[in-house]
From Swiss-Prot:
Catalytic activity reported: AMP + ATP = 2 ADP
Pathway membership: Purine metabolism; AMP biosynthesis via salvage pathway; AMP from ADP: step 1/1
Encoding gene (name): adk
GO molecular function terms attached to this record: adenylate kinase activity; ATP binding
GO cellular component: cytoplasm
Pfam entry (one): ADK
Stored NCBIfam families: adk, PRK00279.1-2, PRK00279.1-3, PRK00279.1-4, PRK14527.1
Origin superkingdom: Bacteria
Residues binding ATP, per UniProt: G10, A11, G12, K13, G14, T15, R128, T137, F138, Q195
Subcellular localization(s) per the UniProt record: Cytoplasm
Quaternary state and interactors: Monomer.
Enzyme Commission numbers on file: 2.7.4.3
Protein name in UniProt: Adenylate kinase
Amino acid sequence: MNLLIMGLPGAGKGTQAAKIVEQFHVAHISTGDMFRAAMANQTEMGVLAKSYIDKGELVPDEVTNGIVKERLSQDDIKETGFLLDGYPRTIEQAHALDKTLAELGIELEGIINIEVNPDSLLERLSGRIIHRVTGETFHKVFNPPVDYKEEDYYQREDDKPETVKRRLDVNIAQGEPIIAHYRAKGLVHDIEGNQDINDVFSDIEKVLTNLK
């Protein structure tokens, strides 16, 4: 099986990806792992990527696309199939992936799209607070401290509602054209993500069992 998994930050994509890999024995290909492996193995694209990262610059699409192609060309993919996680991030990368798969003679069989209401994600992602003295982490809604006094806690910039909302808005704007592109090919399977982790996986399992 050759799959993509998509979903907004906080939708539980990482958790479900791990469950899919364990149950269906496909190769889990995450963007971070790909970059680290390519740089460690000093592949042509890995060396190029490192040169940008060392300068503190963004890695251009053609290098990212090249790293993906290197990984998808490896022998284990032919044997196990793959679950691609964190790529493509833009419609341009989606078109590049289509081209890569066509060149390698690989067929994409399904996109698992975990859907969670953005307002729920905003609450989930922006609720983290940290105790100023102990450094303990809590969540305003899901794991509130017993003795909550606002002045005793702080939030990291990344966790503040306005920062989280910006991140979600960017992800929505980038993700919608990708979903539309693959939906037109009949590949997208929407999964309700606002339920228990095991129920989410049960829904995914039904979809993937029918794909086999």
